[in-house]
Structures are given as structure tokens and as C-alpha cells.
């Protein structure tokens, strides 16, 4: 007999029992997709050992969802091979909103999707058992996949001493690390989304492939809800709205580096202005460090040896330089410009730095995935005893910032990875416990990701939920025990001795470009007044009203409003439609009556008409709306 632990209870099982054997004794076990054993995700067919700690996962768990989607990708490949036997499967990973599979020697269109979907449905009905096979010898694996040059290439890259695994279901077998569902039966709702061209390993010099994207769910109801969400997401696509609202553009000559237009810069400046005010009140000092730095800095930071392939490098006077991919090393140099005492800790240093990181062209997407972006970093230098309190301060700052935009969020605490190389066990335990206590005291729900921290410290990730319930990883709070040591940072402690500070590295927006993309989609382009690129548009009824419109525009601009005048020859109704299409918050129509009575005819973005409004009432109300950072109109 062996003893295992599940849900904090100990169970005795016969020696040789699998996770599936144990699961069969649990109610609703047919929903289980896999099992986490000692913090490692595994197949349900895994044999259990004495002392194992188990957690069964379903589709609603991130691990379970990944298993479900990964199996669905294999079912897609199996269906394609049944319909087009000459196709050559390459890889089929899980992605954020589903999965894809790449094929060589295949030509299809979306007209073929119904046939593939029907075949996947048939494979699910056949209820194939999914089994794992391990090759202890690389040559055996090469022989098994000899007819597929893509699999052969992958197998050849495996270390000689590493086991190679594959999974089979019916007549289909694929090279894969797993884990997978026990059978094909649970995949009851399957939908193909689109197809595109791709290159093997993302390299344009390699073989051209056909990529098929799909998504799957345990029930038709969940699939319908997801497809509805995708339709809503299309309406909110920041790339479409960014063009329609004249906020930004993409140019072929500078892929992944967006061009912000004047209207987009108004939103940008409002975001940055809010961020600066928030941080000044929280005791942060702002710096600005160079973008182009000598190789020597990146060698000290470790980027040159570990991150060089993601950096843009060049030579100046025969010396190697790199455009910074991160702000952290520059802040380390700033810290070293003078001596420090524990009395000035926590020392909060902030920087909105322009960073550049290489991304393959196929991964670029609007403002969400770029090569150049601004990151709102801050580095807080402190003593070990201050970690908990300062983390709580940062969490309170997170709460204030995201609530300002009406964004819900959840937090994830990632703990020490198995191969952590920096810091003692004691320091890791103290640091992790401090972050966890701060999370508890913040009264914000959080989950723990065991072993998912960086090698230099535990971290808290901030996941934002938008208006259509999608989640985005934005900010992070990272405890860094690495860089202060690498850069030989020091401070004088209370005993008058030299010590190395602990550093909290945190970003709230994360990438400001990405956060702006999220906001465009969250608000559907209908920004609250304080963020809006155009607060008021004055609409003249006739040419004779233009001087008064310009007079009001000038006066209101001096109060800090973004005001434009439409004195074109279009009809008033057309001018109003144009303003509404550009999501202007307030439209003010000026005709003879308004000028004679010194009043305003105000129309809101939601088409509410407010006639005979006094100028003072209008201005005072929208001033309050703007200055209070209100998310809803006050008129």
C-alpha cells in the first residue's frame, strides 16, 4: 500500500495505482483533465508513489484547460490527415485563445472547415484512448518518425540522455511531451477559426506551412459563449478603432513600432500625467536613463549572455552597444552615483523608459505585441524587514490605479523554481512569506503558482479583466535578489556596516502601449472625459456663428479642454454624426438662438439633448467630470 495526499487528506491506495484509479473513486471524476503531482502537471495514467501530493484539474483550471486544448490540437491533426493523407503535421501548440496546428504539403481554405469539424466530431465519438509511449533510445524515435522531416529535426535536437515521448489515439501518433486527456471523448464542442500562412520555426527562409487555428470546449454552451465573446472582441479590436479614431498607425518601414497621431498623444499624455501624479504622491522620484548603452553594462546585468538574441545591437567606434530591452540596469547605475543609508529606505525610483525587444514579425499585433514600447518601471531599494510593508504599499497603489480605469484584476504569487540559483533557502522563504502576508493584508484574492518565480526572486503578477471578461497580464511586482548583488550595490545599515539592499522591481501599466490597447478595447473607443482625445466639438449652424464658436473654443482650451470647431458646409445632422463616430464626449450646437440668449445646445455621446444650458453650468459640470477622473458622464 502507498499513502498519497489530496485536498489535505491522506489516502491509502494499492501499490501501482494510477491517478486515474484514484480519481475513479471521486465524484464527477469524468471532468478531470489531468493531475498535478508534487507541483508537476501529469497524465491521469501516471503511476502514483508514496507521499505524492495530488490536485486533480478540470477544464476550469489553467492546467486542465491547456491539456484539453492540446488534445484538441492532436484531434485536428488526426482529422486533417484522414481527409488529406499527403499532409505533413509539424507542431500544434496551445495559445492564449485556443490552439493551432501547422501542416506542410497542404492547401485548404475556410470552405474546408466544416469537413474538418465533422471529422473531429467523429474522432470524439470514437472515444479513442490516448496512450503515452516513451522512447529510451533516440534512434528508435527517429525510426518511428522517419517519414516526417520536421519531427526528425526536433528529435535530433533532444539531448542523448533525455527520454522522448509521443502520444497516440487510434491511428494517429504525434511527438509530444504531454500531458493529454485520457481519451478523445470529452471534446464535445470544436470550432475552427481561421487559417493563415506560416514558416517552419518562424523562419522565412524555411519551409512554408499552412496554420489552422481552432478552439474547443467540453460543452456547446461554452463554445457559443466564447464565439459571442470573439464577435464582441472584433467590434472592440484596438487596431480597427485605432485607425477609425485616428489614434495611431503601423508602418511597414518600422514593424512593431507604432506611430502615435495627435489624437492618440492626447490619451498618452493623460495616462502619463495621471501616472506621474500618482507616483509623486506615493513618494517616488523619477529618473531617465539612456537607451543606448555599452556592452559592458549588459555583461554585468547578464543580458548579454542570456538575452542577446532579443536585443538590438550595433557597433560604435568599434565597441559593442545595445538598445536597452529593460530599464533595470540603468537604475542600478543611478543608485551607485552616491552613498546610501538605511535611513533613506525605502528608496523609490521610477522611470518610464523606452525599451526595444526583438519579436518575430509573425508575433506582432497592434499595440499588444510590439518591438518598441514604454515600460513604467520602478525600483524600490529596501531592507529585508521592509519587504512586506512596501509590497503592501505597492498593492495599494495597484488598487488605486486600476480602479481609476474601472478594471478588475486578480493577483498570482509565483514561488521559488526548482533550479533557483540566487539566495539562500532561508532568504527565499522569508521573501516569499513577506509577499504572501502583504497579499493577505491587501484583502485582494490571489492564487499561488508554485515554482513559477524567476531565478532571482518570487513575484506577484497582475492580471486585468476587461469589459468582455478577457484577462490580460499587465503589471508585476518582482522581488530581485540578483541585480543588487551583480552590481555590487551597498548601503550602510543600522550597525554602520555595509550591506546589499533588497530590491522590489515593479511595473503597474507594464507596457504603456499594450495598456492603451487594452483601454481602447475595454472602453470600445468611448473614453471617459479625462482620457478622451476630444472633449467638446462646437458645431456651427451657419457661417455667421463661427466667430462665437472660435471664441468659446479658445476660452475652453485655456481651461484644459480639448475643443474643436466644425464650421464646415455639412448639414448640422451630418456634423453631429461625424462627431459621434469619433466618440466626442460632448457636442455643442451654436445657432442664432444660442448666441442671442448666451446659452448652449448640448448633445451627449449617447444622444441625450440638453437645450438652453448656461455656459457656466456646462463648464463647471465637465470640469468636475474631468478633474474627478469620472468614468461616467455627469451630463
Curated annotation (Swiss-Prot):
Residues 1-58 form the TGS domain. GO terms for biological process: threonyl-tRNA aminoacylation. One of its GO terms (molecular function) is threonine-tRNA ligase activity. One of its GO terms (cellular component) is cytoplasm. Keywords: Aminoacyl-tRNA synthetase, ATP-binding, Cytoplasm, Ligase, Metal-binding, Nucleotide-binding, Protein biosynthesis, RNA-binding, tRNA-binding, Zinc. InterPro entries: aa-tRNA-synt_IIb, aa-tRNA-synth_II, aa-tRNA-synth_II/BPL/LPL, Anticodon-bd, Anticodon-bd_dom_sf, Beta-grasp_dom_sf, TGS, TGS-like. This is Threonine--tRNA ligase. The lineage of its organism: Bacteria, Pseudomonadati, Chlamydiota, Chlamydiia, Chlamydiales.
Amino acid at each position: 500500500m502507498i499513502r498519497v495526499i489530496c485536498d489535505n487528506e491522506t489516502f491509502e491506495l494499492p501499490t501501482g495505482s494510477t491517478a486515474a484509479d484514484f480519481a475513479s473513486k471521486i465524484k464527477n471524476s469524468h471532468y478531470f483533465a489531468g493531475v498535478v503531482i508534487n507541483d508537476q502537471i501529469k497524465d491521469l495514467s501516471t503511476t502514483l508513489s508514496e507521499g505524492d501530493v495530488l490536485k486533480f484539474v478540470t477544464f476550469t483550471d489553467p492546467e486542465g484547460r491547456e491539456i484539453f486544448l492540446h488534445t484538441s490540437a492532436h484531434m485536428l491533426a488526426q482529422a486533417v490527415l484522414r481527409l488529406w493523407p499527403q499532409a505533413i503535421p509539424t507542431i500544434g501548440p496551445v495559445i492564449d485563445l485556443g490552439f493551432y496546428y501547422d501542416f506542410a504539403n497542404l492547401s485548404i481554405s475556410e470552405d474546408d472547415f466544416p469537413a474538418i469539424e465533422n471529422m473531429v466530431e467523429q474522432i470524439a465519438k470514437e472515444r479513442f484512448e490516448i496512450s503515452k509511449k516513451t522512447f529510451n533510445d533516440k534512434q528508435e524515435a527517429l525510426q518511428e518518425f522517419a517519414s516526417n522531416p520536421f519531427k526528425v529535426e526536433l528529435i535530433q535536437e533532444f539531448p542523448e540522455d533525455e527520454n522522448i515521448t509521443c502520444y497516440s489515439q487510434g491511428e494517429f501518433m504525434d511527438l509530444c511531451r504531454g500531458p493529454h486527456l485520457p481519451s478523445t471523448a470529452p471534446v464535445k464542442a470544436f470550432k475552427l477559426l481561421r487559417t493563415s500562412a506560416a514558416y517552419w520555426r518562424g523562419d522565412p527562409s524555411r519551409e512554408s506551412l499552412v496554420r489552422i487555428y481552432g478552439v474547443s470546449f467540453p460543452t456547446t454552451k461554452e463554445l457559443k459563449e466564447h464565439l459571442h465573446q470573439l464577435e464582441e472582441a472584433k467590434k472592440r479590436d484596438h487596431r480597427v478603432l485605432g485607425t477609425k479614431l485616428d489614434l495611431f498607425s503601423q508602418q511597414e518601414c518600422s514593424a512593431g513600432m507604432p506611430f502615435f497621431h495627435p489624437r492618440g498623444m492626447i490619451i498618452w499624455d493623460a495616462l502619463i500625467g495621471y501616472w506621474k501624479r500618482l507616483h509623486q504622491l506615493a513618494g517616488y522620484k523619477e529618473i531617465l536613463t539612456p537607451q543606448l548603452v555599452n556592452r559592458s553594462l549588459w555583461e554585468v546585468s547578464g543580458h548579454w549572455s542570456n538575452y542577446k538574441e532579443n536585443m538590438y545591437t550595433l557597433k560604435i567606434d568599434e565597441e559593442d552597444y545595445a538598445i536597452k530591452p529593460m530599464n533595470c540596469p540603468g537604475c542600478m547605475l543611478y543608485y551607485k552615483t552616491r552613498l546610501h543609508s538605511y535611513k533613506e529606505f525605502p528608496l523609490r525610483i521610477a522611470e518610464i523608459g523606452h525599451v526595444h525587444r526583438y519579436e518575430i514579425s509573425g508575433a506582432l499585433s497592434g499595440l499588444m505585441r510590439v518591438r518598441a514600447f514604454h515600460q513604467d518601471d520602478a525600483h524600490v531599494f529596501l531592507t529585508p524587514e521592509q519587504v512586506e510593508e512596501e509590497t503592501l504599499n505597492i498593492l495599494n497603489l495597484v488598487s488605486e490605479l486600476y480602479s481609476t480605469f474601472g478594471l478588475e484584476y486578480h493577483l498570482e504569487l509565483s514561488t521559488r523554481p526548482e533550479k533557483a540559483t540566487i539566495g539562500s533557502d532561508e532568504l527565499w522563504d522569508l521573501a516569499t512569506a513577506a509577499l504572501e502576508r502583504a497579499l493577505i493584508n491587501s484583502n485582494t484574492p490571489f492564487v499561488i503558482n508554485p515554482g513559477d518565480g524567476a531565478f532571482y526572486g518570487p513575484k506577484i503578477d497582475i492580471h486585468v479583466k476587461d469589459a468582455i471578461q478577457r484577462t490580460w497580464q499587465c503589471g508585476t511586482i518582482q522581488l530581485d535578489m540578483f541585480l543588487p548583488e551583480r552590481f555590487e550595490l551597498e548601503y550602510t545599515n543600522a550597525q554602520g556596516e555595509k550591506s546589499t539592499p533588497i530590491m522590489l522591481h515593479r511595473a503597474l501599466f507594464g507596457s504603456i502601449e499594450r495598456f492603451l490597447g487594452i483601454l481602447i478595447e475595454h472602453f470600445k473607443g468611448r473614453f471617459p472625459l479625462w482620457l478622451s482625445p476630444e472633449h467638446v466639438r462646437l458645431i456651427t449652424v451657419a457661417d455667421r456663428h463661427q466667430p462665437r464658436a472660435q471664441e468659446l473654443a479658445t476660452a475652453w482650451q485655456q481651461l484644459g479642454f480639448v475643443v474643436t470647431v466644425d464650421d464646415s458646409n455639412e448639414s448640422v445632422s451630418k456634423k453631429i454624426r461625424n462627431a459621434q463616430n469619433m466618440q466626442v464626449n460632448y457636442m455643442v450646437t451654436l445657432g442664432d438662438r444660442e448666441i442671442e440668449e448666451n446659452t448652449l445646445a448640448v448633445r451627449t455621446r449617447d444622444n441625450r439633448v440638453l437645450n438652453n444650458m448656461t455656459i457656466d453650468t456646462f463648464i463647471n459640470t465637465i470640469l468636475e467630470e474631468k478633474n474627478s477622473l469620472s468614468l461616467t458622464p455627469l451630463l
